[in-house]
Amino acid sequence: MYLLIPAAGMGKRMGSNRNKLLLTLLGKPLLSWTLLAAEASQKIEWVGIIGQPYDFPEFKTILTTISFTKPVELIQGGETRQASVYNGLQALPKAADNVLIHDGARCLVTPDLFDRCAEELLTCQGLIAAISVKDTIKIVDSNQFIKDTPNRSNLWAAQTPQGFKVSLLKQCHEKGYQLGWQVTDDAALFEKCQLPVKIVEGEETNLKVTTPVDLAIAEFILKQRFTH
């Protein structure tokens, strides 16, 4: 299985002007933890890290420090996540039929989740890891008044990895570019192209580290893993 990791995010909500994946979590950059899970995965054979060239020296240092053994390529990202993933798709080895895309900021992902998604992708065209929503969700108008309360049993919170047939995802990206679609994940492109996307049970601990509170929670979860 081939894995693309978008890793170009700035840590503005962290109060930082540098790439948030280079911020430290238990003595290692966030990106290290994501890569360690990829290294331990039984299914992932190749990794592409999508970022900006000025971060590449630090990415290389991370790969050396954690003794990453799988083939890896550093790929220049675009102005948006969507553009970055498109660049990543173009850089995949020709042999790649299927691809997993995983946000580098979801640094608590486990090797098991990578492997389950990789296995499931052999039986479908597209999938995402997701968890059922526990909170009641409200839809509001521009004045912050509630318009509707959707049925919680139909709501799932999207995570990554998200996996797709490479040829289909390339077509979706090209169509999205031509029609000016702007989406926040690749599953949305698949949906707009009327293609099916399956849910794979994600992990509650697979949070996206975006704020200082997220960082503190991630630290707690990692410490629990090490003590058990």
UniProtKB/Swiss-Prot annotation:
<dbReference type="InterPro" id="IPR001228">
    <property type="entry name" value="IspD"/>
</dbReference>
<comment type="function">
    <text>Catalyzes the formation of 4-diphosphocytidyl-2-C-methyl-D-erythritol from CTP and 2-C-methyl-D-erythritol 4-phosphate (MEP).</text>
</comment>
<comment type="pathway">
    <text>Isoprenoid biosynthesis; isopentenyl diphosphate biosynthesis via DXP pathway; isopentenyl diphosphate from 1-deoxy-D-xylulose 5-phosphate: step 2/6.</text>
</comment>
<dbReference type="InterPro" id="IPR018294">
    <property type="entry name" value="ISPD_synthase_CS"/>
</dbReference>
<dbReference type="InterPro" id="IPR029044">
    <property type="entry name" value="Nucleotide-diphossugar_trans"/>
</dbReference>
<feature type="site" description="Transition state stabilizer">
    <location>
        <position position="20"/>
    </location>
</feature>
<feature type="site" description="Positions MEP for the nucleophilic attack">
    <location>
        <position position="208"/>
    </location>
</feature>
<dbReference type="InterPro" id="IPR034683">
    <property type="entry name" value="IspD/TarI"/>
</dbReference>
<protein>
    <recommendedName>
        <fullName>2-C-methyl-D-erythritol 4-phosphate cytidylyltransferase</fullName>
        <ecNumber>2.7.7.60</ecNumber>
    </recommendedName>
</protein>
<feature type="site" description="Positions MEP for the nucleophilic attack">
    <location>
        <position position="152"/>
    </location>
</feature>
<dbReference type="GO" id="GO:0050518">
    <property type="term" value="F:2-C-methyl-D-erythritol 4-phosphate cytidylyltransferase activity"/>
</dbReference>
<keyword id="KW-0414">Isoprene biosynthesis</keyword>
<feature type="site" description="Transition state stabilizer">
    <location>
        <position position="13"/>
    </location>
</feature>
<dbReference type="Pfam" id="PF01128">
    <property type="entry name" value="IspD"/>
</dbReference>
<dbReference type="InterPro" id="IPR050088">
    <property type="entry name" value="IspD/TarI_cytidylyltransf_bact"/>
</dbReference>
<comment type="similarity">
    <text>Belongs to the IspD/TarI cytidylyltransferase family. IspD subfamily.</text>
</comment>
<dbReference type="GO" id="GO:0019288">
    <property type="term" value="P:isopentenyl diphosphate biosynthetic process, methylerythritol 4-phosphate pathway"/>
</dbReference>
<keyword id="KW-0808">Transferase</keyword>
<keyword id="KW-0548">Nucleotidyltransferase</keyword>
